[in-house]
Design a protein with these regions (language model features):
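Acidic-enriched, low-complexity/disordered segments with a strong bias for Aspartate over Glutamate
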Residues: 14, 50-52, 65, 70-72, ...
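Generic hydrophobic secondary-structure signal
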Residues: 31-36, 51-56, 75-77, 107-110, ...
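Conserved nucleotidyltransferase catalytic core and NTase-mimicking acidic/glycine-rich helix/loop elements
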Residues: 126-265
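Metal-dependent nucleotidyltransferase catalytic core
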Residues: 1-49, 54-103
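Conserved NTP/Mg2+-binding pocket subregion across the NTase superfamily
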Residues: 2-9, 66-67, 73-157
């Protein structure tokens, strides 16, 4: 059965987004701006996409988030203060996703140009050394931690723990690659492609990443285990090689000096 064309979907979702923005403006007249993220902002919604809308306020007290159905379209409306939106510039966990999202964010209401100013700033922003170091330190730590859980699962023949640990490792490897390559993540839809095409990446990423993450299915737990362990080993060494000489914090430097082979990695 042939569904609606892309142009029909785009028109339908744009109309629903505009209705949602009008509703938010009526209910909350003091909003500083309204924007929409995701596939609707990019002009590529699918037939079952949702609308991810954000209202921005200058006030300390924010309205409660809410959601509803507009016909068959699910609409989610969240709220952030201008200060919270600007805080993402210094948040290691939010930075790369927020910058990527800003590239395709669609502004629906911005009477004083507040959102345009913030979006323009994102386009010119590079991560600070502090953001890079904190991001890579966190991922280095988490990869080591879950390598232990992975090996415990394998040793105890606990398939769930082995597969779960492998998936978590793959997710932390994603974040390490994002930081090492200074990637702007547009959305989950593009993450896979951006990770695999990154210049700085583990040698066997194309084999190990999909197996560890679980998006290339296999009944053989041994394959998942071996791929996840190799992904750990190669990513940890990649971080050491690419960023080790730039680390400023003494405790992170000390951790990087610890021989990985000594710990089975």
């Amino acid at each position: 059965m042939q569904g609606p064309s892309q142009s029909q979907l785009r028109r339908c979702y744009d109309e629903a987004a505009n209705r949602a923005a009008s509703f938010a403006r009526r209910e909350y007249p003091h909003l500083a701006g309204i924007l929409v993220h995701g596939s609707v902002a990019r002009g590529e919604p699918g037939p079952f996409s949702d609308i991810d809308m954000l209202g921005v306020t200058n006030r300390k007290k924010k309205p409660a988030d809410f959601s509803y159905f507009d016909g068959d379209i699910y609409v989610g409306v969240g709220f952030l203060s201008v200060a919270e939106l600007e805080k993402e510039f210094t948040d290691p966990r939010a930075f790369f996703w927020a910058r990527g999202s800003a590239e395709t964010t669609k502004i629906l209401y911005d009477p004083k140009g507040v959102l345009r100013r913030i979006m323009l700033r994102w386009k010119k922003t590079k991560p600070s050394h502090q953001i890079l170091e904190k991001s890579l330190w966190d991922e280095y730590h988490n990869i080591i931690e879950y390598s232990g859980k992975l090996r415990n699962g394998w040793l105890k023949r606990n398939d769930f723990l082995t597969r779960y640990s492998a998936r978590v490792i793959a997710e932390h490897v994603e974040r390490a690659i994002i930081a090492l390559n200074d990637l702007s993540i547009i959305s989950e839809n593009y993450l896979w492609r951006q990770i695999l095409n990154a210049r700085k990446r583990p040698m066997h990423l194309r084999t190990d990443y999909p197996l560890a993450l679980g998006i290339r299915g296999t009944e053989e737990v041994a394959k998942v285990y071996r791929s996840a362990l190799r992904l750990c080993q190669e990513t940890l060494r990649l971080v050491k090689d690419e960023f080790g000489g730039k680390v400023k914090h003494a405790r992170f430097r000390q951790l990087l000096k610890e021989p990985l082979e000594k710990h089975g990695l």
